[in-house]
Each structure stands twice: as structure tokens, then as C-alpha cells.
């Protein structure tokens, strides 16, 4: 058995969970924030049998595509009197960072 842990853009998560569910996979989602822009992410946990890993990864590839967005980063910490003019930056968002880890023991109570 394997545990698939994936960090995806929060905009991709509803479609991803729907596609996983239609293929019979259960998943748990946790909202997360991080990175340079502190944009919203979702961390997906999905336990599957070894032979199902490639199918699950295919669902992620189909659901989590990369795209370019222009976003304004949060302003830096400034001293009184300093001024910061925010400039939008081009940022690649979407896609997925996926970890597949072995499960030594699984128990459903």
C-alpha cells in the first residue's frame, strides 16, 4: 500500500477530488498556504494499493495543469515613512508536487 501526498493549487482541488471520486478513490484534503506569494494550496492525502498508484498519478496529471498568473506579492516589512509600490510578477501556478510513500501499517476503525 502507498500514501500519495500531493500539494496542488486550491483552484484545482475541486476538479481533482471529483475525478478521484469518479474513479473510486477516497481522498482527504487539507487547506495550506505557503511559498513566496503565500497563495492558497490544498494538500491531498490518498491511500491506494501499489498497482493503483499510476492511475492516481494520471488523475493528478489530468487535473493539475500549470499556468501563468500575474500576482502581487505581499509587501515587505517596512520602517515608518518607507514606501512600497507593489509590482505584479509573473508566476507559474498550478501543477502538483507529489510524494508517494510506502505504508507500513493501515487500519480503519
For the regions a protein language model found, what residue spans apply to each?
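Positively charged, small/polar-rich N-terminal and surface patches that mediate targeting and assembly
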Residues: 1-109
